[in-house]
From Swiss-Prot:
One Pfam family matching this protein: ACR_tran
An example Gene Ontology CC term for this record: plasma membrane
Subcellular localization, as worded in the UniProt entry: Cell inner membrane
Lineage of source species: Bacteria, Pseudomonadati, Pseudomonadota, Gammaproteobacteria, Enterobacterales
Family: Belongs to the resistance-nodulation-cell division (RND) (TC 2.A.6) family. MdtC subfamily.
Native species: Salmonella schwarzengrund (strain CVM19633)
Name this protein carries in UniProt: Multidrug resistance protein MdtC
Amino acid sequence: MRFFALFIYRPVATILIAAAITLCGILGFRLLPVAPLPQVDFPVIMVSASLPGASPETMASSVATPLERSLGRIAGVNEMTSSSSLGSTRIILEFNFDRDINGAARDVQAAINAAQSLLPGGMPSRPTYRKANPSDAPIMILTLTSESWSQGKLYDFASTQLAQTIAQIDGVGDVDVGGSSLPAVRVGLNPQALFNQGVSLDEVREAIDSANVRRPQGAIEDSVHRWQIQTNDELKTAAEYQPLIIHYNNGAAVRLGDVASVTDSVQDVRNAGMTNAKPAILLMIRKLPEANIIQTVDGIRAKLPELRAMIPAAIDLQIAQDRSPTIRASLQEVEETLVISVALVILVVFLFLRSGRATLIPAVAVPVSLIGTFAAMYLCGFSLNNLSLMALTIATGFVVDDAIVVLENIARHLEAGMKPLQAALQGTREVGFTVISMSLSLVAVFLPLLLMGGLPGRLLREFAVTLSVAIGISLVVSLTLTPMMCGWMLKSSKPRTQPRKRGVGRLLVALQQGYGTSLKWVLNHTRLVGVVFLGTVALNIWLYIAIPKTFFPEQDTGVLMGGIQADQSISFQAMRGKLQDFMKIIRDDPAVNNVTGFTGGSRVNSGMMFITLKPRGERKETAQQIIDRLRVKLAKEPGARLFLMAVQDIRVGGRQANASYQYTLLSDSLAALREWEPKIRKALSALPQLADVNSDQQDNGAEMNLIYDRDTMSRLGIDVQAANSLLNNAFGQRQISTIYQPMNQYKVVMEVDPRYSQDISALEKMFVINRDGKAIPLSYFAQWRPANAPLSVNHQGLSAASTIAFNLPTGTSLSQATEAINRTMTQLGVPPTVRGSFSGTAQVFQQTMNSQLILIVAAIATVYIVLGILYESYVHPLTILSTLPSAGVGALLALELFNAPFSLIALIGIMLLIGIVKKNAIMMVDFALEAQRSGGLTPEQAIFQACLLRFRPIMMTTLAALFGALPLVLSGGDGSELRQPLGITIVGGLVMSQLLTLYTTPVVYLFFDRLRRRFSRKNSKPVVEI
């Protein structure tokens, strides 16, 4: 401790070092980015491919499977899932945490290139990829509305200009434009007119394609001039296509307008987007996995004036949803909680020391330690988030402990009449080892967290490092700045036989005297205390098994996301009506601020909604209570279901599900999967522990199955290719030509006019031109009958997959739900060919459950090793660790009392308690050992004296930690659901520990001392003289 004496005698140097630490911390604070939580996003890449008109089964077998085989060879792929629907396939690749997203993207592109030769012809474009997770909620949604512009024209402007500009902003991973599609020339064929003119659909398609070409024509030049050749080889509008000659009938020209309606429309008319009951185009912006959400949103907002300047006056651009306000509000709440904790801790010190000068010392030490931590956070690449700021809030109680122990011991010597500088030296020397032991053993608690892998390890690393750095800085400050300030600011007082008995002092003396009396009784009834101690151990085990558990507290981010699932045979027009009905119900709720939604595309019977709630200060209900209220109203809507879930800052996996948690069924037999999935889903829907049970297996869509008579076809001179081409031309929204414009490329889309395809009778009007040029009706060589068909085909890996999604009813924990699912699967007797496992957040929860006890045991073992090294003893660390069972009981009972499940945040609280409560024992054991060595006291006398002498600092440090955590319990507002479990755990553990360990620790100390002496006598051998 001589090294630290230099700081006492060199106050200027000490003050300047503390000022340097503070200035570095302030600079680091200003540079730190802001985020809701530490960066825990898995690198995710989405691969998309399309083949218009292809059935889901065709897309799965001919497009998804070749791509999956190639993509599955990429190193670092954690999970690969795919979903194939009408005309489209989407493959989600989730990589390991340590995989660089840009390197993964290069590998994905190489795998797509390798699979290209295996993909079917007729695909309008090569498969593409995006570095974004489609299951993540957008960080911002912009809407475009107009009274005069068509939806197609709005969509074109949004995708061609706005989306391109936004995508260039740092942090933006994907800009998904919804609500319509690109403009196109649509050719709606009249089957009867074609038949009358003897024109086949293929002939129409070929005529349009041939009439709209873009080829280089070259140039002509002479000795002086050069002329570039330009022709009118392109048709760009519906008016230009209408007079196009497609056929000659008996020498008379048949024009396209004679047999079809040609209109300027959109590529896919089966798309609709809305915002607050108005048709709208939605720009859904998602961030890159490694991007900071606040910085990305700020970048978008900074770009908005430029975007609005380039928008025509007829278009209205609005922000429909922004994730950043609730994040900022949550962080502001944590910062306020931190300030309150510092104030309360300093108040505790003042009440105990009853001196303004003495209180000023920890009032300086605490901010220096906390502010200095910001510099280390910046150097480590951390952010200001809920967890790191909660770590600093909790650190308030820790960093003041070191200063209190040093200050209180110096003050004791000053009260005995010692001179200030001498008291500072002597007091620091006496407790220096104690402070080092307390700090190192506390940091040791977090070593297992730093070594923990996966998402929980990544999530908790910033918390552990931030708290460890704060404790380290506090250790240095308490042994340098604190004794220096004590030596130069405090004054010695005359020795008093009786302490002053005023106010808190009188109460403290009374408590100390009462404690001494009760401790004497306890030391005479050690067996009873031993039974109590063993009872706390047993109660810990029982409570841990019984308490409900979850992965992460359910957050209220002020944003809800909803998935609509309608009858599988619903039409687009009916589905658009359902979207409007659902939006009206939600918009009428008093807690809702804004509603946007869209439907259409390859999945006509589904839709998505994004709901922004009013700020927490303007509504009384939580997000979950609002969902529960809306669920009752939404259930009355026939023919469709809307599943709502609160958007969370942590969402694991790339599956887009209609609920927060998923259970995935896998099978190598698609038939077995389709047989068992409805049975399992029905059984799970009946469980009271689950809500909103739904599945992505949609195999009950309406299909018209055409059966060709191949013999008749051969006799009539028709081949299968011609028949299939007929159907694709008629009903597949076939893209038959491309219109090239300076800003974009647009399609010519051909199909039978919707007026002539209202029902199945449209097939009777279809005909094929055979080899002899005769029109042969489709009914001559084909029969059709209705059947069921899948609307989507899903894979995981290379196996058929079906994901059952579910939410949790209010009051139900994730552990109760997973146990009920596992029990149900066992009771159903599902065959081995169908395998079930949790996925996404539920899967991470299962993995975390398996490692929680290991983590706690590892933390205790690490603390034991550190204490054993410091004390050079196998026994004394056990005495110190005997404080833990009572703290565990208090923490678990408090969680039960507040109806809070045991989550990852509560686990942090348990880990913190391991570090906090042992401080009391360390102070007792240190003084007892010193009294035995230097004072010649018996173990009983030594531990009794140590308990009385250290009663005041024990009460001060415990109350400081208690008041440091109390604002977390009492906090409300944004983000309180994250803070409260941590505060509840710590406060409950501290209260119970303080009540019991003041008595159990001396009893355990004496027990191990007797045990040690007994073994020493047994192992001692008489000395034999030779």
